[in-house]
Amino acid sequence: MAAWANGVRAVLLDVSGVLYDSGGAGGGSAIQGSVDAVNRIRHAGLKLRFCTNESQATRSHFAQKLKRFGFSISEEEVTAPGPAATRLMKERGLRPHLLVHNDLLPEFESVEKSDPNCVLIGDAAENFSYKNVNRAFQVLINLQKPVLISLGKGRYYKETDGLKLDVGAYMKALEYACDIKAEVVGKPSPNFFLSALEEMGAKPEEALMIGDDIVHDIGGAKSCGLRAVLVRTGKYRPSDEKHPEVTADGYVNNLAHAVDILLASQDCNQ
């Protein structure tokens, strides 16, 4: 029996690359067995949270997309960086210049954006043109104390037609050009995982993270005291299992495989 499966009371699921692969005409497709795996987690009475750095849509649109793929999910079960970034900016009186996907813009309607004193960057996809990235650079370089807020720092993610550059690549370009360090809202920030646990009413030692990113999903969760399992779907690469800095508590073929092991452990402990 896998040691990582013992005593789990709460499950945090990464989404893209674990539940579904994004892209294509329909916006993506569910990974085989993942819809049923989510239902089995619920049926077992485990606490469940969907933890994503998704920054191409609001939580509401994101939940609706997953429902179209067949998943049982509500907006309230999604932990995403957009709402956290909104709270942060309001608390600190920050007025962002936005470099984000058009579908995420409604997330920031309540934030003052005139005379920007920071830049907020997300996965802007086609909006990552030279003109737009350079404009973000110009805003930052002209600030006395430049502030760059990034919705995650992933290097790449998988869509149905291949791997795509993520927000982290563009974040690093702005960091380098302006000689600054971005503030990351989202995985692997400890606050992201701790916020998800608080929303679930769960403790780190009783929670399991399942993801496809060895650094941001697995490393981020383990730094907060969670157990973490890497799936061999999504952006997974065989070299991840020999990562020099991060070792997962387990490696599984996909989400369905992880749930098989997890629920077998639950049965043995009853």
Curated annotation (Swiss-Prot):
Q: Could you tell me the keywords of this UniProt record?
A: Cytoplasm, Hydrolase, Magnesium, Metal-binding, Nucleus
Top-level taxonomic group: Eukaryota
Q: Where does Mg(2+) bind?
A: D14, S16, D212
Q: Which SUPFAM superfamilies match?
A: HAD-like (SSF56784)
Give the species this sequence originates from: Xenopus laevis
Gene that produces this protein? lhpp
> Which protein family is named in the record?
Belongs to the HAD-like hydrolase superfamily.
Compartments (UniProt record) = Cytoplasm; Nucleus
Protein's name according to its UniProt entry: Phospholysine phosphohistidine inorganic pyrophosphate phosphatase
- Taxonomically, what lineage is the organism? Eukaryota, Metazoa, Chordata, Craniata, Vertebrata
Q: Which residues bind substrate?
A: D14, V15, S16, T52, N53, K187
Q: What does this protein do?
A: Phosphatase that hydrolyzes imidodiphosphate, 3-phosphohistidine and 6-phospholysine. Has broad substrate specificity and can also hydrolyze inorganic diphosphate, but with lower efficiency.
Q: What is its EC number?
A: 3.1.3.-, 3.6.1.1
GO biological process entries: phosphate-containing compound metabolic process
Provide any one GO MF term from the record: inorganic diphosphate phosphatase activity
Q: What's a GO cellular component annotated to this UniProt protein? A: cytosol
Cofactor entry:
Mg(2+)
- What is the cofactor note? Binds 1 Mg(2+) ion per subunit.
Reactions accelerated catalytically:
diphosphate + H2O = 2 phosphate + H(+)
